[in-house]
């Protein structure tokens, strides 16, 4: 097992810098998820750690050893890809053991490791099948098995569930998490799916445009997002953002409604309200002109606008709720659930 250090890491292609001074400490045995939208640099960062991309400047350390110039084969890592990367003419057993065979391991050692990994992943009955005879989830287990037999210091996962349907993704992400906890191997996982990130990671590194927006636990990112980007990216449905002004511990919305909160902050802010924190209240200060009810079974999402404005607002209510278009509904929100951001910098305002 291994700790990993990213120190002032920069990646450029020609004159274009795509990763900007990335810093991060990953502890031994930790499961880290790098999450962000398409094109943010998350897969590039993972490939740099793997040794598949060169480092422009900065250092990558594995177990306190700088590995910038080490070949991938010498970094003691194993990678699981989105497209499985299985050899179609080989059996599952041969696919899982092929890397060990190339490294010169004995046949007995290869068979032992493959059998152990197959037992962990519950694919022992498929060892003599070809990949074409397997489902997508089974193929992904084989790809993970190929990584496990290596007995590496670090697992790297590059969006391994993207090709699976929604139900199977939920099942497989739970299996990956249980597997990582069982093996205790330091793991880095890349995804664009914030729900996947929240359920898998001990900590999340949120990337945006090649910059680290925030690096913390899922709960830290949910409860105290450091920037507008993190606030809007983490959580489903997304946080509501309303123009507001703070004065003397009161928050005034653009339609004149006033909410208690804001602490010692003052001036114009972007106010963030999570839909699930809006509580139906006939005397509440937040009045929403409902345009659409989205029935999801356990909850109902009410989509509309802050009354008297064009600012969109979504409320999440438990159970089954119906409201005709144009219905005015009032909501209250606890002061501790208000999030305030500087409208110029996008950074969280000190409370």
Curated annotation (Swiss-Prot):
Top EC category: translocase
Signal peptide (from-to): none
Gene3D superfamilies given in the database record: 2.40.50.100, Nucleic acid-binding proteins (2.40.50.140), P-loop containing nucleotide triphosphate hydrolases (3.40.50.300)
Main location: membrane
Residues the record lists as binding ATP: 36-43
GO MF entry, a single one: ATP binding
Pfam families, per database record: ABC_tran (PF00005), OB_MalK (PF17912)
Gene Ontology terms: biological process: carbohydrate transport; glycerophosphodiester transmembrane transport
ABC transporter domain ranges (all copies): 4-234
Keyword Electron transport on entry: no
Record-level GO cellular component terms: ATP-binding cassette (ABC) transporter complex, substrate-binding subunit-containing
Keywords for the protein's UniProt record, in alphabetical order: ATP-binding, Cell inner membrane, Cell membrane, Membrane, Nucleotide-binding, Sugar transport, Translocase, Transport
SUPFAM superfamilies: MOP-like, P-loop containing nucleoside triphosphate hydrolases
Localization: Cell inner membrane
Entries under PROSITE patterns matching the protein: ABC_TRANSPORTER_1 (PS00211), ABC_TRANSPORTER_2 (PS50893), UGPC (PS51315)
Known EC number: 7.6.2.10
Membrane topology: Peripheral membrane protein
Function: Part of the ABC transporter complex UgpBAEC involved in sn-glycerol-3-phosphate (G3P) import. Responsible for energy coupling to the transport system.
Family: Belongs to the ABC transporter superfamily. sn-glycerol-3-phosphate importer (TC 3.A.1.1.3) family.
Protein name, entry field: sn-glycerol-3-phosphate import ATP-binding protein UgpC
Organism: Ruegeria sp. (strain TM1040) (Silicibacter sp.)
Name of the gene this protein is made from: ugpC
């Amino acid at each position: 097992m291994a700790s990993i250090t990213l120190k002032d890491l920069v990646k450029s292609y020609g004159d274009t810098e795509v990763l900007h001074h990335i810093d991060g400490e990953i502890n031994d045995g930790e499961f880290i998820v790098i999450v962000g939208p398409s094109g943010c640099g998350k897969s590039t960062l993972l490939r740099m750690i793997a040794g598949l991309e060169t480092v422009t400047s900065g250092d990558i350390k594995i177990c306190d050893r700088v590995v910038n110039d080490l070949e991938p084969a010498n970094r003691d890592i194993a990678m699981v890809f989105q497209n499985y990367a299985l050899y179609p003419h080989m059996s599952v057993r041969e696919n899982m053991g092929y890397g060990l065979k190339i490294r010169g391991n004995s046949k007995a050692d290869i068979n032992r490791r493959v059998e152990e990994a197959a037992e962990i992943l519950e694919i022992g009955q498929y060892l003599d099948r070809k990949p074409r005879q397997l489902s997508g989830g089974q193929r992904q287990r084989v790809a993970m098995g190929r990584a496990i037999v290596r007995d590496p210091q670090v697992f790297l996962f590059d969006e391994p569930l993207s090709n699976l349907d929604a139900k199977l993704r939920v099942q497989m992400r739970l299996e990956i998490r249980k597997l990582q906890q069982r093996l205790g191997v330091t793991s880095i996982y890349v995804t664009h799916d914030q729900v996947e990130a929240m359920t898998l990671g001990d900590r999340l590194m949120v990337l945006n445009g090649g910059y680290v927006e925030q690096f913390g636990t899922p709960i830290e990112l949910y409860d105290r997002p450091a920037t507008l980007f993190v606030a809007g990216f983490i959580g489903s449905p997304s946080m509501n953002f309303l123009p507001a002004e703070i004065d003397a511990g009161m928050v005034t919305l653009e339609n004149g409604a006033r909410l208690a909160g804001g602490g010692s902050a003052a001036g114009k802010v972007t106010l963030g309200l999570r839909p699930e924190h809006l509580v139906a209240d006939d005397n509440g200060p937040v009045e929403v002109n409902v345009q659409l009810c989205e029935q999801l079974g356990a909850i109902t999402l009410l989509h509309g606008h802050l009354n008297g404005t064009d600012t969109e607002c979504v409320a999440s209510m438990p159970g089954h709720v119906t409201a005709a278009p144009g219905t005015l509904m009032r909501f209250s929100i606890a002061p501790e659930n208000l999030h305030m951001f500087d409208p110029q910098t996008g950074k969280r305002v000190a409370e």
